[in-house]
């Protein structure tokens, strides 16, 4: 949240670019909060006592951050970029995921929702783990497309012998590649859960992947905050 505020207030970016990048970092706040709700020993039960409906709201960020970062990259390399109605197709992942959550979780009665949370059924039942894998995979796809656009733009600059102007491609490549690594670990974790539906998977391995994803994400955001402020 702090990073998102700094980006908008800094004036270093065009309005569209600033809003897209700030939105991306805001989603990272919701991702961290979501994971804390699901697995934080004390916090999850405090939230559950308040209302089970708080759960999974933050998980929508997994379906939003990929499109936001992709559009941010597009806004930088295409000077005349502006958000238009045609970009609404990038909302398909988050809308699809919201529809799924409505039927699989929010539409259930309170007792079923509590059972899902208390017994970690979101990690054990096929519909949850398969949808989680799809969402995480779409996220990784957007990040891969972002890397492709950056590399393509760099090659175009070399061929035309143009200057990079105001675009810091090194910062951009670090940003996108770093989060692509985080997203890849997340996909490996999700796929491991799917495999666990059919074959035994060591719980310690899943915990290791989960903690690696969570802390790598936090450390990388702090690293970017340091780079941005210098």
Where are each of the predicted segments found?
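The cytoplasmic-loop to transmembrane-helix boundary for the fourth helix
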Residues: 77-103, 126-129, 164-180
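Membrane-interface helix-boundary motifs at transmembrane edges
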Residues: 8-21, 75-87, 155-169
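C-terminal TM-helix exit segments that contain a strictly Trp-centered aromatic cap at the helix terminus
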Residues: 34-38, 96-108, 145-146, 182-193
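First transmembrane helix
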Residues: 1-13, 143-144
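Individual alpha-helical transmembrane segments in multi-pass integral membrane proteins
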Residues: 18-31, 43-76, 87-102, 132-136
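Extracellular-loop-to-transmembrane junctions of the mid-late helices
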Residues: 103-110, 114-148, 206-213
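Helix-loop junctions on the outward
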Residues: 30-55, 112-116, 189-202
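Membrane-proximal linker segments that couple transmembrane helices to downstream signaling/catalytic modules
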Residues: 226-230
């Amino acid at each position: 949240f702090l990073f998102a505020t700094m980006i908008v207030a800094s004036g270093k970016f065009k309005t569209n670019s600033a809003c897209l990048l700030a939105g991306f970092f805001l989603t990272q706040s919701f991702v961290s909060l979501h994971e804390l709700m699901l697995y934080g020993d004390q916090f999850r039960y405090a939230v559950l006592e308040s209302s089970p409906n708080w759960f999974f709201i933050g998980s929508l960020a997994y379906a939003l951050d990929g499109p936001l970062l992709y559009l941010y990259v597009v806004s930088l390399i295409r000077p005349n970029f502006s958000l238009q109605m045609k970009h609404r197709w990038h909302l398909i992942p988050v809308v699809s995921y919201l529809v799924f959550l409505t039927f699989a979780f929010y539409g259930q009665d309170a007792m079923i929702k509590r059972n899902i949370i208390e017994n970690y059924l979101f990690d054990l039942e096929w519909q949850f783990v398969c949808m989680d894998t799809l969402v995480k995979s779409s996220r990784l796809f957007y990040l891969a497309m972002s890397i492709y656009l950056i590399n393509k733009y760099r090659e175009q600059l070399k061929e035309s012998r143009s200057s990079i102007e105001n675009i810091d491609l090194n910062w951009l490549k670090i940003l996108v590649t770093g989060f692509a690594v985080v997203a890849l670990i997340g996909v490996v974790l999700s796929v491991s859960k799917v495999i666990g539906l059919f074959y035994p998977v060591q719980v310690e391995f899943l915990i290791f992947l989960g903690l690696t994803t969570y802390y790598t994400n936090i450390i990388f955001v702090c690293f970017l905050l340091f780079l941005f402020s210098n």
